Every structure is written in structure tokens, then in C-alpha cells.
Amino acid sequence: MINMRKTHPLLKIINHSFIDLPAPSNISAWWNFGSLLGVCLIIQILTGLFLAMHYTSDTLTAFSSVAHICRDVNHGWLLRNLHANGASMFFMCLFLHVGRGIYYGSYLYKETWNIGVILLLTVMATAFVGYVLPWGQMSFWGATVITNLLSAIPYIGTTLAEWIWGGFAVDKATLTRFFAFHFILPFIIMALAIVHLLFLHETGSNNPSGINPDSDKIPFHPYYTIKDALGFMFLLLTLLLLALFSPDLLGDPDNFSPANPLNTPPHIKPEWYFLFAYAILRSIPNKLGGVLALLASILILLIIPLLHTANQRSMMFRPVSQTLFWILTANLITLTWIGGQPVEQPFIIIGQLASMLYFMLILILMPLAGLFENYMLKPKW
């Protein structure tokens, strides 16, 4: 009798995706982040669902409903801490996942890569609207500053901003619709993640060498299921350490004060995972220019496949490109640091230089490095 998992209409799909899937034999721990992101998404949806049962999306009661969750709901404090720090873990895994894709040339699977960039944008949108929900000072002012950027769009900007606010400023209508968005978007992310996997399984996984691995494949189960399980343990351990020992480490103290439209915090800044983009936004002393730079800093990922000039796919055997990649990594860490600093010297000039270097590395230096490495590999005799 043929195994049921190979014949049953539903089990067959799961089997082809997670059990009998042929996978390269040499993929490293950098390939664990896809499954870790799946676990993060499930954790966020489950904790978020239970939080939504007790949260009220009204300006008068939102802040106190979050306090009520933490004080009065059974294990509400744990749900809230897991959800807030789960977002940080989500972005940590996302950035490492994207970094892996750039380093090993995975972006040459264009459909998978483009869906991935759309996923990144959707997750960023979800995190932004979610941060507004507790209705603390930084929630309110973060929402005000970021949605206000829409007014920089010529001609339709102000109308667009007011349409999103549901009034003339961030208020009750804004909070209600942001809660609706925050509830629906994770399910859209889940659907997109399935499409992401669908495109990936059309081509099969890339591997560290960047060479076609078809001649040496192994079944996903048990080899990579057990490897993923180890990753899950590390992820859950880190998340629990964060949520149980220092739940407010990555948050902003201003968010412990209820939103007050009459009192602006001294330093308005988003959560740590948006600081690199915020630094790029602030580095241009023009509203529209800053908004365009902010968009470009993320959308630039879409043109990375077009900028691939090297004859080799992976950076594994390309030392010049490797050096530039790690400079880019250091540059992004620098931008993250600058985004959390006040707008004064020397932070302004450091932010401007780091922003310029970010675009130069991706658009000019890395493609040139690829061409240089091609030249160096050509026989000279």
C-alpha cells in the first residue's frame, strides 16, 4: 500500500513541501531563518489574538486596556511581553534572512525575492500600526510624525494624510482603523509567505557555494526538520529570556505615559528595527526628499538582482564583495545608532555620510566589485 502522505490531496502538498522535499546537502544555519520567521509569525498571531480579546481600540480606554491586560488578565503580562518582544525577534530574523539572501546571491530567484520584499514591506506596515495601539506618548507621536510624511506628496499629500487619519489629526478614527489593519495584515503576511514558499519550491533552495545542487540533494525530513527544531529552541530561549528578564529593554520609556497631543516628547523615534530607515529619512533636510530616500532605502532591494554583475552567484569565493558586504552591515548598524540619537552635530553629519555610503555601496561599489572579480578570474596568459 502506498503511503497516505503521498496520495492524500492535502497531505501530499505538506509532504512535497516539508517531508520529501529535495534539499541541498550543504545548506548552513543561515538557511534556518525562513522557518524561524514562520514560527515568529505563528507566535505573533496567537499572542495577538489573545491580546485582541481584551484590548479596546478607543482613545479613552486603549492605554488603560493594555494596563488591564498586564495587571488583571491571567498571564496577560506574559502575552504582552511575548508579543512586543516577538516583534523584535521577527525583525532580527528578517534582517538576517535578507542579509543571507544578499550574501549568497539568493536574489537571483527573482519571483521569490520580489515576494520577499513585499513581505518585508507588509511586516513593516504591520509593526508600525501595531506600535500605535497601546496609545502611549511614543505611539501617538510616532503615528503623527510618520503619517504626516504623506503630506509631502505633491498635490494630493494633505488630502491623503487626512484620509488615512479619518480627520484633521491622529485621533480616535485613526486608532480604530490601525487596529483593524493590525488584525488583518498578519493573515495577509501568512498568505504571502505561502506564495513565497511556492515560488521557492519551483526552483529549489540556493546553497552557500552558489553552484547548482541538483546532483546532491537530501530529503528535508529528517535532516532539516531536526536542524530547524534546534533553531526553534534557540529562538524560543532568546525570546523567553527577553520577555521574562528584561521585557522593556527594547521599548521606549515614553510609552509608559498616556498619549498627550499637547505635550511633545523631546526625542521622537520609532522602535529599533526602523531606526536605520528613520536615520536615512532625517539625513535629508527636505521633507519630500527624505520621504523618497526612506522609500528608496527599502525598495532598492527590488533592483538588487539587476545589479548582479559577477560571474559567480555567491559571495563565498569573492573576497572584495565580501568586504563590501560587511561594510554595508556595519553601515546599517551605524544608521540604527544614529536614528536613536538627537538631531545635532556630530550625529547629523555621520547620518548623512552613512546614508550616502548605503546607496553608494549597493548601486555603485558592489556591482563594480563584481566586474573587478570577473576580471581577476580571467586567465592572463
From Swiss-Prot:
GO CC, alphabetical: mitochondrial inner membrane; respiratory chain complex III
Any matching Pfam family: Cytochrome_B
GO biological process, one term: mitochondrial electron transport, ubiquinol to cytochrome c
GO molecular function (one): ubiquinol-cytochrome-c reductase activity
Keyword Heme (UniProt): yes
Binding site residues for heme b b562: 83, 182
Residues engaged in binding a ubiquinone: 201
Annotated cofactor note: Binds 2 heme b groups non-covalently.
Membrane-related topology note: Multi-pass membrane protein
Official protein name in the record: Cytochrome b
Domain of life, per lineage: Eukaryota
UniProt entry keywords in alphabetical sequence: Electron transport, Heme, Iron, Membrane, Metal-binding, Mitochondrion, Mitochondrion inner membrane, Respiratory chain, Transmembrane, Transmembrane helix, Transport, Ubiquinone
Chief localisation class: mitochondrion
PANTHER family the UniProt entry points to: CYTOCHROME B (PTHR19271:SF16)
Residue numbers binding heme b b566: 97, 196
Transmembrane intervals: 33-53, 77-98, 113-133, 178-198, 226-246, 288-308, 320-340, 347-367
Cofactor(s) needed by this chain: heme b
Quaternary structure (record): The cytochrome bc1 complex contains 11 subunits: 3 respiratory subunits (MT-CYB, CYC1 and UQCRFS1), 2 core proteins (UQCRC1 and UQCRC2) and 6 low-molecular weight proteins (UQCRH/QCR6, UQCRB/QCR7, UQCRQ/QCR8, UQCR10/QCR9, UQCR11/QCR10 and a cleavage product of UQCRFS1). This cytochrome bc1 complex then forms a dimer.
Function comment: Component of the ubiquinol-cytochrome c reductase complex (complex III or cytochrome b-c1 complex) that is part of the mitochondrial respiratory chain. The b-c1 complex mediates electron transfer from ubiquinol to cytochrome c. Contributes to the generation of a proton gradient across the mitochondrial membrane that is then used for ATP synthesis.
Localization annotation: Mitochondrion inner membrane
More about this protein: Heme 1 (or BL or b562) is low-potential and absorbs at about 562 nm, and heme 2 (or BH or b566) is high-potential and absorbs at about 566 nm.
